[in-house]
Every structure is written in structure tokens, then in C-alpha cells.
From Swiss-Prot:
GO cellular component: plasma membrane
Family as reported in the entry's similarity comment: Belongs to the G-protein coupled receptor 1 family.
Disulphide bridges: 124-203
Regions of compositional bias (Low complexity) in chain numbering: 350-360
Lineage of origin: Eukaryota, Metazoa, Ecdysozoa, Arthropoda, Hexapoda
Chief location bin: membrane
Residue ranges that the UniProt entry lists as topological domain Cytoplasmic: 78-87, 148-167, 238-411, 471-484
Domain of life: Eukaryota
Species: Locusta migratoria (Migratory locust)
Intervals, Extracellular compartment: 1-54, 110-126, 191-215, 434-448
Compartment(s) where it occurs, according to its Swiss-Prot or TrEMBL record: Cell membrane
Gene3D superfamilies for this protein: Rhodopsin 7-helix transmembrane proteins
Function as written in the Swiss-Prot or TrEMBL entry: G-protein coupled receptor for tyramine, a known neurotransmitter and neuromodulator and direct precursor of octopamine.
Membrane association type: Multi-pass membrane protein
Name of this protein: Putative tyramine receptor 2
Amino acid sequence: MVRVELQAASLMNGSSAAEEPQDALVGGDACGGRRPPSVLGVRLAVPEWEVAVTAVSLSLIILITIVGNVLVVLSVFTYKPLRIVQNFFIVSLAVADLTVAVLVMPFNVAYSLIQRWVFGIVVCKMWLTCDVLCCTASILNLCAIALDRYWAITDPINYAQKRTLRRVLAMIAGVWLLSGVISSPPLIGWNDWPMEFNDTTPCQLTEEQGYVIYSSLGSFFIPLFIMTIVYVEIFIATKRRLRERAKASKLNSAMKQQMAAQAVPSSVPSHDQESVSSETNHNELPPPPAPPSKEKRRKTKKKSKKKDQAAEEGRFLAPAMVAEDSVTDNSVSVGPVAKNHLAEDGYTCTTTTTTTTTTTAVTDSPRSRTASQKGSTAPPTPVQPKSIPVYQFIEEKQRISLSKERRAARTLGIIMGVFVVCWLPFFLMYVIVPFCNPSCKPSPKLVNFITWLGYINSALNPIIYTIFNLDFRRAFKKLLHFKT
């Protein structure tokens, strides 16, 4: 009896000793024999401290992505300065980034902590398809935004007419349709997924070499090439416009001095003003010419309104084009080259002639924008406030538009730089791994880090808009009820 009991006890001890290494292999402590951490009965593959750090960090990224992109969408639809047709591209980008945060990231958090897929093969395939679809849509939307900016800068007048809501929505639909064409082939058989799926089967993107080349070209490398070429062209165009503006400014400065020398009478001190307005009452000046007829003023006003609208829609016009299109029939009679660059320097230059050209105020200081009354022998008479000339108003709008376009190009460059830093490591790994032997495959932690580096791009886009775009910054503050 004693011998049998001892044998039974030894067998029980042996079986328990055999179970301990199995627990250690699953993830427990081989030295202490402790069981691995678990959450809701699901055994985790990493220590508890790593679970806490990973869960908090990745959840924070998800939260930032959701909040930021929701604010972008709400800003465009609720803040009037942002309610313009080209911002629908940004809405589409925000929706793509939002779907990454809602449909893709949470499953990856669970997969990172558990290190095995417990949601079944159907959910696995749908998750992988959504991953490729949403990330590709985000990248292609960036490409569409770059193209839209390029056309707006290089061909502002024509593209302002072509940039209709229907055209923009068609481009956005094309972006999502192309993303679906790139992401869907694995669902219809272009994959190397196993026929049977269990808890130990990894849920990962297919490594079928043909599809890897196809999807990487469509999702990343071709859009990257297009965006690089487009941004270089935008940079060159912006530099060219700045050089044209600098040349026009020098030419206009010389013209201003020449016109001032011809228009200033000897009785007016040259240090007080550079020229004298033809619309004020001075005994020293000849009587002003008759004002234009009502019919001519009506036509001029209508034409100027159209030019102003074209400038507003174009948002970035060549300096020579602006001056030529903005100057009405009452412009100063100068040479053709000077006429093209007249409105570039920012000085007030108004004219009131119909058949006879009269030079008017070209001043540097606010006090000399009205006619000086020094040396006048007649009693002072009230001076009516002078209306701002149309082409000066349009020139000011173009100066603002130029500043906006420079900021937009800079923002686009930053978005592209962040995009390359975030996604290039992932797609290099995605292309290289299927063509190398198993020994060159990266560790699961490195794969997870590179994957999340790509996901972070969806969180950074709204942050970039907030920092570098004043309208988005104001809209965010308004939505969050911050005082501006």
C-alpha cells in the first residue's frame, strides 16, 4: 500500500513537473514557473508592464487620430472660410485616416499584445483588406491634394473654372475606387493564405510576390513619384513668381520716380509728397478733366468685378497677368512692359482720365495719400475721401493669395516629408521580405513598430493642418470653445 501510494505521488509530481515547462513555453517565467499575464481570460504574450505601456501608447495614438480627423471634417463643414470646394479633398483624406483609426488600429493593438489571432479567418481577411484600402486611400488623397494645388498654381484662371464640385467629387470617387481595385485582389484568390485557419495561424498581409509588387506600386511608389514631381514643379513655379514680382517691383519703383518728377509742380516740396492728386482742389494745378460718363463707369465697375472674381477663384495669379487683367480702360498711359507690371509695388496709383492721362497720387506715407495743401492760396475746401482703385484692391488680394500659396506649398511639403518618413520603411519591408529567405525576416516587434509608424501618419495630418493653416487653427479653437 505504501509503495503504491508513493508511486502514485511520484507520478503526480512528474506530471505537474512536465506541465510547468509547457506553461513556460507559452510565455510564463521559466525560472519561477509563473503563468503569463492574461486579460479577460486571454493569455498575453508580453509582460504586464509592457502590456500597460503598449496599450496606453497605442490607445493614445488612436484617440489623437480620431479626434484630430473629426475636427478636420467638422471644421470644413462648419467654418465658412474653409467651406470651399478644394477642401473636400482634405475631408476625403480625413475620412480615410479616420477609418484607419476605427477599423484597423484597434485590431492591431489586440494582435500586438496577444501575438495570435483570435477573431477568426473572416474577420482576419476583412481586417487586412480594410488595412490596405484605408491606407491606400489616405496616400492617394495626398496625391490628389498635391495635383489640385499644382493646377491651381500653374493655371489659376482656367483651373478656377474647371474646379467645380462635380469635378472634385469625381476625383475623390476615383481615389476610393482605385484604392478598392488595389486592395481587393486577395479576397478573390490572389494570395498565399492557408486553406485552414486556427489560433496559431498568423493573420498577416499576403506575401504572394506578384501581388506585393502590384499593390506596393499602386499604393505607394507611383503616388510618391507623382507627388515628388508635382511638389518640385510647385516649388519652381513659386520661385518664378517671386522673381517676377521682384523685377516688377524694381520697374514700378523707377516708374514711380519718373512720374513723380513729371507731375510735381515747383511750388510743392519734394520731401512732402511724390506727386499731387488730380482729384483735390489746388490753385497750382490745372482743372481736372471731366469725370467719365455713367455708362463708362458702369462698364468699368462690371469688368472690375469680373476680374476680382477671377482673382478670388484663381487664388494665385502671375504678377504680369494680374496687372494686365486688373488695370481698366482708365489706366495710366505707359509702355506695354510697364503696364504689365504697374500694380506690383503696392503703392496707390489712381487715374481719372478718359482721353487725357493725368498722373495721380503715388505715395509712400498715409498722410500724403490725400492732396497736400501746402502753398495753396485759396481757402481750404473739404476733400472727399478717395475710393480705392479696383486694380489696387485686386493687387492686395493677390499679395495675400501669394502668401497663402507659399504657406500652402510649404504645408504640402511638410505633409509629404512626414508621409515619406512614416510609410517608406513599411513599404520597403513589405517589398523585401517576400523575396528574401526566412533568415532575413525582421522580428515581430520590429514589424509592429514599422507598421505603427505608418499608422501614425494618419494622426499627424490633422496636426500639420492645425500648426500651419490659420483657418484650420481658428476653426479648431472655435469647435473646442477656445478664446481666439
